[in-house]
Design a protein with these regions (language model features):
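Structural and coupling elements of P-loop NTPases
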Residues: 1-524
């Protein structure tokens, strides 16, 4: 077995998805605590006098206590190397999450027991389904009042189409949490609170006879539920899990650390290792072939003192070594990897080598774009990174015209990250750009980063546009003659038409079908 194949077998590259406030960032912190990567779990919210979450680094994340940009966290657990791609928790940042899901091999889905499947969770799960990603489910906040677990299992099956197979089952109702039954061993682990969840939770395993006496009717009800689950065949099955047909379900409380170890152990025992990646021709790239990777995220100014630009890549094959020269498939140009890092929140460590499944931050990646394929030896091109079509639009202008140079530099850098698209008028250039995004909060972040990172305070105001379409030069000339339509150009050079009225767009598509008006679909 080659070194690349062996190391790939040790990798577990995954992401956590959830609706905002379901507990994703909390669970991320607790994974790091249990793996020994941090000595004390960071606070999820940035409250005055307490530190913000370890994985949150951007100024706005610290102030608001939400995850806005995804970060790659690496830690070891039970002899495996975990690569956890932290994802934005706010609904307006689903596009960044979408890209992260293109770089992982499995997913942990966090559900609030009081709310069940929520809109953002459902939207992100559809992305998981499109990539056939295995999903582990964690029913969180069971120490608080919530819905019956059997009801939640029905909802999982009905709304997302995965067969839920509980690996642990709760004793007690939500808000009166006594512990869980391990359905494999039959053991009962009693729930014990820890102070603010800052330390690993003690795990008291007691006999079933003792549990029957001490937990009374709560134990009897849990045993009845487990017998029902056994009768309907709702048991964890590795084959159906890896085929994305079933989802192992765990019950716990991330805030108090209960159930965290169960999920980590399942990632080791059941989750897929890094495997061969398919190229655009659907041919697998052998793990032991020349080094290859693809860019799934670009982030500017993670180091304020250097105003740098990092391209995050997922290694797909071979052994990455710092200093090696990779070729970019899109441009055919070489890229020297002199500066390669692992990023842990705002902290960095130099990466000298990496293997399939690993995430590496390539510093000073000014010529790399999201979706770029990199390789050594035999050329390879991996599939494009999917993206959502913009749904909201805004205009931007610098408050101080003397800072226009900084404003323009900020536009270029933040546009290159691909979350907010900067649209420019072909005649006016940077003078009156339109921002296009998936959600409104992205504009607030955009303005904040322009001011903090580029010293270019700006005004961002809503634009009246409702729809966007790709067009061409010939159609653009006709569209310019019609009111309520504006022709702009994306950073990649493609012309787009912005429509103030969806009705007008529909009429044009019907009355003048010869016009080029292509929807901006996933991957374009």
């Amino acid at each position: 077995m080659s070194q690349s194949v062996f190391e790939a077998s040790r990798r577990r590259t995954f992401a956590i998805i959830s609706h905002p406030d379901a507990g994703k960032t909390t669970l991320t912190e607790k994974f790091l605590l249990y793996a020994g990567a941090v000595g004390e779990a960071g606070a999820v919210k940035a409250r005055e006098g307490r530190r913000s979450a370890t994985s949150d680094w951007m100024e706005m994340e610290k102030k608001r206590g939400i995850s806005i940009s995804s970060t790659a966290l690496t830690f070891d657990y039970r002899g495996m190397q975990f690569n956890l791609l932290d994802t934005p928790g706010h609904r307006d940042f689903s596009e960044d999450t979408y890209r992260v899901l293109a770089a992982v091999d499995s997913v942990v889905m966090v559900l609030d027991v009081a709310k069940g499947i929520e809109p953002q969770t459902l939207k992100l799960f559809e992305v998981c389904r499109s990539r056939n990603l295995p999903v582990i489910t964690f029913l969180n906040k069971y120490d608080r009042p919530g819905r019956a677990p059997l009801e939640l299992l029905d909802e999982i099956e009905e709304q997302i189409g995965l067969r839920p197979t509980p690996a642990t089952w709760p004793v007690g109702i939500p808000g009166d949490f006594r512990g869980v039954i391990d359905r494999t061993s039959g053991e009962f682990t009693r729930f014990t609170r820890t102070v603010r969840g800052s330390a690993i939770a003690p795990e008291e395993v007691i006999s079933t006879d003792q549990a029957a006496v001490e937990e009374g009717s709560a134990w009897a009800q849990a045993v009845d539920d487990v017998e029902l689950l056994d009768a309907v065949g709702a048991v964890v099955d590795s084959e159906s899990f890896l085929a994305a047909e079933s989802t192992p379900v765990f019950v716990g409380s991330a805030l108090t650390n209960f159930g965290v170890r169960h999920v980590l152990d399942t990632l080791v025992d059941l989750a897929p290792a890094a495997g061969e990646r398919l190229d655009v021709h659907e041919s697998p790239r052998a793990l032991d072939s020349g080094c290859s990777a693809f860019v799934f995220k670009v982030q500017a100014n993670m180091d304020k003192s250097h105003r740098d630009r990092i391209a995050f890549v997922r290694v797909c094959s071979g052994k990455f070594e710092r200093g090696m020269v990779l070729t970019c498939h899109r441009t055919g140009k070489p890229f020297a990897t002199k500066y390669a890092s692992q990023v842990f929140g705002a902290e960095r460590s130099t990466v000298d080598e990496a293997f399939p499944g690993d995430v590496v931050g390539l510093v000073n990646a000014t010529d790399l774009q999201i979706g770029d394929s990199l390789y050594v030896g035999e050329p390879v091109e991996f599939p494009a990174i999917p993206r959502f079509a913009p749904e909201v639009f805004a205009s931007a202008r610098p408050l101080d015209t003397g800072r226009f140079k900084q404003f323009r530099r900020g536009l270029d850098q933040l546009d290159s990250e691909g979350v907010v698209q900067v649209l420019r008028d072909p005649q006016q250039g940077d003078a009156n750009p339109v921002l296009a995004a998936v959600g409104q909060l992205q504009f607030e972040v955009f303005a904040s980063r322009l001011e903090i990172e580029f010293n270019a305070p700006s005004e961002v105001t809503p634009s009246p546009y409702e729809s966007i379409r790709f067009t061409d030069e010939e159609s653009a000339e006709r569209l310019k003659e019609i009111g309520g339509i504006r022709i702009m150009r994306r950073g990649d050079g493609r012309l787009v038409a912005l429509f103030e009225s969806r009705y007008r767009l529909q009429r044009l598509e019907s009355d003048e079908p010869e016009l080029v008006l292509e929807p901006i679909n996933v991957g374009t």
